[in-house]
Amino acid sequence: MSVIDQNAIAVGPRISEADVGDYIALLKPRVMSLVIFTALIGLLIAPGHFHPVLAITSLLCIAVGAGASGALNMALEGDIDSLMSRTANRPIPRGRVTRQEALAFGITLSFFSVLTLGILVNWFAGALLAFTIFFYVVIYTLWLKRWTAQNIVIGGAAGALPPVVAWAAVTGSIAPEPVWLFLIIFFWTPPHFWALALFRTDDYARAGVPMLPVVAGPDATRLQILLYTIVLVAIAAAPWPLGYFDAVYGVVSLALGAGMLWLAIEVFRKRDRIPSLRANRKLFGFSILYLFALFATLGLEAIARMIAPLIW
């Protein structure tokens, strides 16, 4: 037997070590949970009756589409993930799943989610979901993230689309209400992720990702966080006086906005290392609570309107 034959036998075909948990990790469950939540609010506030089976189908398809995007993102960012401590334990850097397996998994789920939503619900929603996946995978992952400090600003559009897709699933159209939801998430994304990037700057620099703190420095990032937070608070409060959302939402948005703005000011003010790290972490954590509470208020208002005729 030749040396080549012996080597071929020794190497052999790679046997995947992945288990179910690894494939679940590819879906980015935390991101999926946020997508499902914001999409659910889009469904709840949409006008008209929507059959529960179609509602569940829509949420499932949007969730699977988000998971597909996550899997494709990990497949295309395996080189970056392996260099960052925050992502080094993901399935691909650990060698549990190959990039080819993740690509196949993500592509399969993408087609399944889009086709199922289009066939069973409506093709407008299916097309929006397809665009969301495309934008996240191609525009953000392959282009923006690697080449510009505005990566999460422009790329944030993908994360802001799920409630729009959900509204379209119910109505087959787009209206001002889902556009407001889109804008809230869009302007929420930069302060949220830049706060994370401020205490993960070394991680991003090591991986060569041009996040704003790496490219422009922490002071410029703090200013941008404050400016985007001011816009976010204004955008989030605007639907109330304009008549799109109720007064309860308006009061909650102002209260949450005050907290968000205060923490953004703290991030801007505190420049020493330890106080700065604490301020960044507080803003990052509160921003999650901010978005959840804001959207939950809309959802609870919608549920209250649904059950009011049954009570009175």
Swiss-Prot record:
Gene Ontology cellular component list: plasma membrane
Keywords, comma-separated and alphabetical: Cell inner membrane, Cell membrane, Heme biosynthesis, Membrane, Transferase, Transmembrane, Transmembrane helix
EC number: 2.5.1.141
A molecular function GO annotation: protoheme IX farnesyltransferase activity
Bilayer-crossing regions: 34-54, 56-76, 119-139, 152-172, 179-199, 225-245, 248-268, 283-303
Record keyword Signal present: no
Signal peptide region: none
Pathway: Porphyrin-containing compound metabolism; heme O biosynthesis; heme O from protoheme: step 1/1
InterPro entries: Protohaem_IX_farnesylTrfase, UbiA_prenyltransferase, UbiA_prenylTrfase_CS, UbiA_sf
Name of the top EC class for this enzyme: transferase
UniProt xrefs under CDD domains: PT_UbiA_Cox10
Principal location: membrane
Biological processes, Gene Ontology terms: heme O biosynthetic process
Localization of this protein: Cell inner membrane
Catalyzed reaction equations: heme b + (2E,6E)-farnesyl diphosphate + H2O = Fe(II)-heme o + diphosphate
Membrane topology reported for the UniProt record: Multi-pass membrane protein
Chain's role: Converts heme B (protoheme IX) to heme O by substitution of the vinyl group on carbon 2 of heme B porphyrin ring with a hydroxyethyl farnesyl side group.
Family: Belongs to the UbiA prenyltransferase family. Protoheme IX farnesyltransferase subfamily.
Further comment found in the protein's record: Carbon 2 of the heme B porphyrin ring is defined according to the Fischer nomenclature.
Name of the featured protein: Protoheme IX farnesyltransferase
Organism: Bradyrhizobium sp. (strain ORS 278)
